Structure formats: structure tokens, C-alpha cells
Amino acid sequence: MEKQLPISVWPEWKIIEKIGEGSFGKVYKAQRIVQGKTFYSAIKVITIPSSQGELSSVRSENPDEQSVKEYFHSLVEDCIQEVSTMEYFRGNSHVVSVEDYKVVEYLDDIGWDIYIRMEYLTGFLDYCMGKELTEKEVIRLGIDLCKALEYCQKH
């Protein structure tokens, strides 16, 4: 499945497949080719509000459009704060690195798309697929996980 990002986001990156989806957005595997070399990134797309139903629900509870926009904009700001925190961890070998992000506001309605480009890593289930982990590998993974948690807690 080839999907294009809006041209203004990262024109050099092409989405090649969806690799995940959750309540906070969709994650795609993207590639760019530079001088014959292929590079991969994961691009998370978070849409605020997440659906037309969510927008309608908030509109029904708020007296005016400005209040609705302020509510959803505060969610965008929270998301940007989380991305900024993740950027702080860049370079730590135990935490996924954020490479770039962009926020695109809708012109025709209340809403934003937040694009977060991160290093592309093999998912744990894919890593384990079709092989049995040795005791040594399990211990190494456990230690790496503990180091990541320790680093996050300290910072």
C-alpha cells in the first residue's frame, strides 16, 4: 500500500505500508532513496480530533467554536510536549529516537494532523517470529528494557 504524505510534510519520504494502529494514531513504514541507498523511518500520524464523532461530541458540550478549538488545541500542545520529551532522549540506544515532527492545522474545520518521524525498528513480535529466544537473548532484552526504563526515570 503506497500512501502519500501531504507534499509539505516530507516530500522525500514515501509511505510503503501501515505497521500499526491504536487509539492515538496510525504508524507507517516509510522510505526514501538517496543516491541508490534506501533509508527507513516510522511515521506516526495522530489526528486531533480523532473522529468527526469526537468533534461533534465536544461541540455539543461547548457553547462556542472558539472553546471547541481551544480544547482540541490543548490536546495538540500536550502531544507536542510529549514529542519534545522524546526528542530529549535522542541518541540513547535503549529508547526510540524522534527524528522530526510537524503539525498541520486543517484549513476547513477544527483539526490537526501531527506527523512524528522516528527511527524504524523491528517490532518485538517480528523479532521473535519463527525463532525461539535463547536464555542469553531473553536476559539481554530484559537488561536493555531495564536500562531504558532507568534512563527515562532519571530524565
Predicted regions, residues:
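Conserved N-lobe ATP-binding subsite of Hanks-type protein kinase domains
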Residues: 26
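Activation segment signature within eukaryotic-like protein kinase domains
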Residues: 141-142
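Protein kinase catalytic-loop region centered on the HRD/HxD motif
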Residues: 147-155
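ATP-binding glycine-rich loop module of kinase domains
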Residues: 34-79
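AlphaC helix of the protein kinase catalytic domain
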Residues: 124-134
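Structural motif at the C-terminus of the N-lobe alphaC helix and the adjacent alphaC-beta4 loop
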Residues: 84-93
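Short beta-strand micro-motifs within the conserved protein kinase catalytic domain, predominantly
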Residues: 97-112
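Conserved short submotifs of the Hanks-type protein kinase catalytic core
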Residues: 109-124
